UniProtKB/Swiss-Prot annotation:
Other noteworthy facts: In the reaction, the free carboxyl group of octanoic acid is attached via an amide linkage to the epsilon-amino group of a specific lysine residue of lipoyl domains of lipoate-dependent enzymes.
Name by which UniProt lists this protein: Octanoyltransferase
Reaction(s) this enzyme catalyzes, per UniProt: octanoyl-[ACP] + L-lysyl-[protein] = N(6)-octanoyl-L-lysyl-[protein] + holo-[ACP] + H(+)
InterPro entries named in the record: aa-tRNA-synth_II/BPL/LPL, BPL_LPL_catalytic, Octanoyltransferase, Octanoyltransferase_CS
A GO BP entry: protein modification process
Main location: cytoplasm
Length: 209
């Protein structure tokens, strides 16, 4: 069974990035076992490889870090669970298929949120997991941005639990102008991070056996 490592304190994004990259190298060179990091970051805006500078609107005192993951700008901060699976897609029980991997991540998040009775949506050409908040309007509750090196995955998923959603106003999230974001709290669901972690770990192990 996969090992989940929960980092208890707010983590600087740059420290986490080095942690991930170092472990990816160990998986590649030393065949270290797969792991999943569960992290909560201090406030940061991150840019994926497809970002446009004009999508960074007003970042104030919040640091901006340019990463190697897919996607565009997003926000990480307290109250958001960020999950970094480091999986070896070249191993016998996996598949060398990045699209399939992302589809499995989507299925895992959908199943986890379904636990709370939240109906979720995947919208064509809009990466992430969405919920309907008003007639004809959808808000993103989870972002996905991954990278693969020699078929070992890193970066991952960010799910808004009790995130300060106002911080997303400093960017055009994921390059989608006028897009909305939401959280479990905003949807009326209040849960401790540790309890949420139990659910996502259970559902993760069902998908990534």
């Amino acid at each position: 069974m996969l090992q989940f490592i929960t980092i208890p304190n707010l983590m600087d994004y740059r420290v986490t990035l080095k942690l991930m990259e170092d472990y990816v190298n160990k998986v590649i060179s030393d065949n270290e076992p797969e792991i999943v990091y569960l992290v909560e970051h201090s406030e940061v805006y991150t840019a994926g490889t497809n970002y446009k500078q004009e999508e960074l609107l007003n970042y104030g005192d919040i640091p901006v870090i340019y990463t190697g993951r897919g996607g565009k700008f997003t926000f990480h901060g307290p109250g958001q669970r960020v999950i970094y699976p480091i999986l070896n897609l070249a191993s016998p029980n996996r598949h060398k298929d990045l699209k399939l991997y992302i589809k499995m991540l989507e299925e895992w998040i959908i199943n986890s949120l379904n636990y709370f009775g939240i109906k979720t949506y995947i919208i064509k050409d809009k990466v992430g997991i969405w919920v309907k908040v008003r007639k004809g309007e959808f808000a993103k509750i989870a972002a996905i941005g991954v990278r693969v090196r020699k078929w070992v995955t890193y970066h991952g998923v960010a799910i808004n639990i009790s995130t300060d959603l106002s911080k997303f106003s400093g960017i055009i999230p994921c390059g989608l102008e006028n897009s909305l974001v939401t959280s479990l709290n905003q949807l009326g669901i209040h849960i401790e991070m540790s309890e949420f972690d139990k659910i996502i770990q259970t559902e993760f192990n069902k998908i990534f056996k």
